Amino acid sequence: MAYPLQLGLQDATSPIMEELTSFHDHTLMIVFLISTLVLYIISLMLTTKLTHTSTMDAQEIETIWTILPAIILIMIALPSLRVLYMMDEINNPALTVKTMGHQWYWSYEYTDYEDLSFDSYMVNTTDLKPGDLRLLEVDNRVVLPMELPIRMLISSEDVLHSWAVPSLGLKTDAIPGRLNQATVSSSRPGLFYGQCSEICGSNHSFMPIVLEMVPLKYFEAWSASM
């Protein structure tokens, strides 16, 4: 969950988000080192009046600044590709949930169960209870079992939407006429909040997402009561 004046990413709750956080730190360190080197060179150029004429057209340094950026890009690309393939892998999901975006709410269908579907609207600010989060609470939460791979099938009924839950490392576009999929897996129970992350009209800001991750036995009891 995000909090005011937060500088870093939200706490990772899924293996994918842990990998994304590690990749972010890895890339940020490379960018920091490059920026430090560039600033150092600029400061030298501004503070010295000496010129080394033999290095103005040296083949050696041209070779170095051609090979070195290629190595740096490979160091960034390989972990990035690894995370991308991990995000795309869905092996033997325990549950499949179909998510449809609408202007301006979400609808969910548990395809492994008969007649288990509902719409999820934002709770009006006048109806909030003490402790509720403004513009993030919904009337029907998506209840899912924790520590199990869950496949989300995501599409849209009207315009482009995007189903995103930052703490789980999820952001998948909901495109009319196309079915995208994502993997949901939580390592701990709790409430995880997200929002539509694609501008989709005047009420784009009023499409929150709330996932309630619970142990399997509680999920089975919830699904039986629906």
Swiss-Prot record:
Q: Which domain of life is it from?
A: Eukaryota
The keyword Mitochondrion belongs to this UniProt entry's keyword annotation? yes
Q: Which GO terms describe its cellular component?
A: mitochondrial inner membrane; respiratory chain complex IV
Task: Give cofactor(s), names only.
Answer: Cu cation
- Cofactor binding mode, per the note? Binds a dinuclear copper A center per subunit.
Q: Which residues carry this modification: Phosphotyrosine?
A: Y218
Where in the cell?
A: Mitochondrion inner membrane
The residues the record assigns to binding Cu cation A2 are C196, E198, C200, H204
User: Membrane side Mitochondrial matrix: which residues?
Assistant: 46-59
- What's its EC? 7.1.1.9
Q: What UniProt keywords are attached to this protein's entry?
A: Copper, Electron transport, Magnesium, Membrane, Metal-binding, Mitochondrion, Mitochondrion inner membrane, Phosphoprotein, Respiratory chain, Translocase, Transmembrane, Transmembrane helix, Transport
Q: What class of enzyme is it?
A: translocase
Instruction: Say yes or no: keyword Magnesium present.
Output: yes
Q: Which reaction does it catalyse?
A: 4 Fe(II)-[cytochrome c] + O2 + 8 H(+)(in) = 4 Fe(III)-[cytochrome c] + 2 H2O + 4 H(+)(out)
Give residues annotated as binding Mg(2+): E198
Record-annotated membrane-spanning stretches: 15-45, 60-87
Record-level GO BP terms: ATP synthesis coupled electron transport
PANTHER family under this entry?
CYTOCHROME C OXIDASE SUBUNIT 2, CYTOCHROME C OXIDASE, SUBUNIT II
Q: How does it assemble?
A: Component of the cytochrome c oxidase (complex IV, CIV), a multisubunit enzyme composed of 14 subunits. The complex is composed of a catalytic core of 3 subunits MT-CO1, MT-CO2 and MT-CO3, encoded in the mitochondrial DNA, and 11 supernumerary subunits COX4I, COX5A, COX5B, COX6A, COX6B, COX6C, COX7A, COX7B, COX7C, COX8 and NDUFA4, which are encoded in the nuclear genome.
Q: What does this protein do?
A: Component of the cytochrome c oxidase, the last enzyme in the mitochondrial electron transport chain which drives oxidative phosphorylation. The respiratory chain contains 3 multisubunit complexes succinate dehydrogenase (complex II, CII), ubiquinol-cytochrome c oxidoreductase (cytochrome b-c1 complex, complex III, CIII) and cytochrome c oxidase (complex IV, CIV), that cooperate to transfer electrons derived from NADH and succinate to molecular oxygen, creating an electrochemical gradient over the inner membrane that drives transmembrane transport and the ATP synthase.
Q: What is this protein called?
A: Cytochrome c oxidase subunit 2
What is the primary gene name for this protein? Answer: MT-CO2
